[in-house]
């Protein structure tokens, strides 16, 4: 697994983090002349005529001249934007930018035609792996009894400060340390973890981090839970799979193996020799063609389980078939299939391989 620190933003007022997988890739919005950013989970539109970007925040829109901001509330929408709003509302009802906190919404005062807007939240647009931790104002600290640690009280994140002034932060199960809250941050290996963290009392609000402290009973329990497979019995005749490609199936090599995977589909399709394999909902399927027809697989090539963490298909290595009959196949997967894996550096459960998979 990889343990490089992401970019970290400490936000001390209501803020939104908008993640884009690399530089913006644009697509057409059906029925309009607008464009949309297709490589982001956030709803971002671009109006060519007005030369403005629009970002949807709950039921409202922010606008900016450049995608990095600054952003402000859009007080008047064009007819094209109103039409686009209907489209995206039906397709993405309730969707928010990932990592974003719920911020104060515009309020109606006096006449129904007059809208008074709340303060615009700070919007951070990131094109690389980024984490944001929001505090309610300047950080305030509380001492953890029996340790030399203090933790930040006014945040939902996990930030600690030692007596020597060094900061520790838990992100996706990994520990990072820095001399200030502005960083730079470095990964903390198990051998460098201060012993004070294992002494956090179980009744302390921050006892939840004990599952990520190497060697603690909580960390050992998490390892056991992570290794227990979720099993199912799949009836062959009932299991169906259809794979959609963006154009003709296109395959790229999987490093460290003789296999390749389809890069133009959201499905995990692997080519091994003259056969094709695909994992869907924790079940292996097999076909003689990338378009199918697909049937439940009894076995998969051994090298499938050598797919490295650097590959976007590493998660399929946690899916297995145990045994089968003419009618059913017994399958199972451990938590790594959904991204909860074990870090060899700390022997603790972490979230994600730490690798960035470009779109």
Model-derived features with residue positions:
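N-terminal low-complexity segments enriched in Gly/Pro/Tyr/Ser
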Residues: 1-359
């Amino acid at each position: 697994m990889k343990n490089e620190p992401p970019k970290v933003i400490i936000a001390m007022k209501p803020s939104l983090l908008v993640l884009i997988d690399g530089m913006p890739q644009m697509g057409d919005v059906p029925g309009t002349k607008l464009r949309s950013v297709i490589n982001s989970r956030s709803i971002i539109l671009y109006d060519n005529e007005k030369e403005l970007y629009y970002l949807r925040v709950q039921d409202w829109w922010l606008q900016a001249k450049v995608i990095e901001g600054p952003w402000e509330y859009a007080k008047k929408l064009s007819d094209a934007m109103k039409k686009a709003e209907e489209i995206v509302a039906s397709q993405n009802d309730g969707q928010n930018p990932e990592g974003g906190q719920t911020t104060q919404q515009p309020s109606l005062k006096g006449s129904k035609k007059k809208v008074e807007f709340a303060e615009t939240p700070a919007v951070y647009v990131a094109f690389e792996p980024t984490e944001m931790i929001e505090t309610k104002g300047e950080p305030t600290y509380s001492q953890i009894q029996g340790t030399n640690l203090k933790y930040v009280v006014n945040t939902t994140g996990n930030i600690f400060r030692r007596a020597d002034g060094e900061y520790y932060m838990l992100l996706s199960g990994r520990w990072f340390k820095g001399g200030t809250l502005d960083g730079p941050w470095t990964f903390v290996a198990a051998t460098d973890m201060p012993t004070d963290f294992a002494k956090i009392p179980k009744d302390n609000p921050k006892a939840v981090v004990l599952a990520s402290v190497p060697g603690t009973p909580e960390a050992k329990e998490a390892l056991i839970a992570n290794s227990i497979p979720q099993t199912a019995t799949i009836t062959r005749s009932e299991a169906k799979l259809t794979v959609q490609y963006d154009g003709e199936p296109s395959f790229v090599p999987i490093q460290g193996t003789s296999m390749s995977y389809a890069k133009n589909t959201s499905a995990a399709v692997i080519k091994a020799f003259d056969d094709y394999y695909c994992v869907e909902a924790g079940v292996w399927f097999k076909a003689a063609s990338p378009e199918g027809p697909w049937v439940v697989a009894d076995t998969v090539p051994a090298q499938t389980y050598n797919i490295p963490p650097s590959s976007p298909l590493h998660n399929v290595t946690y899916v297995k078939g145990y045994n089968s009959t003419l009618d059913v196949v017994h399958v199972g997967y451990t938590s790594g299939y959904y991204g909860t894996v074990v870090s060899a550096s700390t022997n603790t459960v972490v979230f994600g391989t730490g690798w960035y998979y470009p779109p």
